Amino acid sequence: MLHSVKALRGSAIVAQDERFGFVVDLYFDDRTWTLRYVVLDTGRPMPQRSVLLEPASIASIDPGGTLSVRLARKQIEKKPDWLAERPVYLQHDMTPTGHRGDGHLRSSEIVMGCSVQALDGSLGHVADLLLDERDWTLPCIVIDTGHWLPGRRVRVAAASVGEIDWIGRKVHLALEREAILAPV
């Protein structure tokens, strides 16, 4: 089932033993468009902390957006506060063996709002990403076409993204505007 990443932000996290925190962001690999971490704000009653949950720890996402995880509260509490220093997507990604990775970890929050360029001109901006809970991929981006097709949102395969200019906040598609017609 596909889930709106935008709608998941702010969703409750239900641990094995109780409701615990909420989703702040989702981090993904910008080469494979695969979810790497769900950023959880633990909220109250303990001091506010941000921890990372791997997709393997997610048991399910209910239709209302609540994420049930395969961890108990104590297991989540033991996770380090990864965002205390700076956002993870600005750090070099660490591999499971603890070695420095290649830095392709990106924040879904940063992607949303980026302008979108088709091969033949401006298309609009990224309004949302869609998450497939079967394989934890982000197969589609949702584009608000803005002035080009007022009031329309279109779904485009993430595989059609040719390049992302993170500094200029532009997503370049390997498609022409006319090839993008499927409304969401």
Protein language model regions, located:
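Peripheral interaction segments used for macromolecular assembly
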Residues: M1-V184
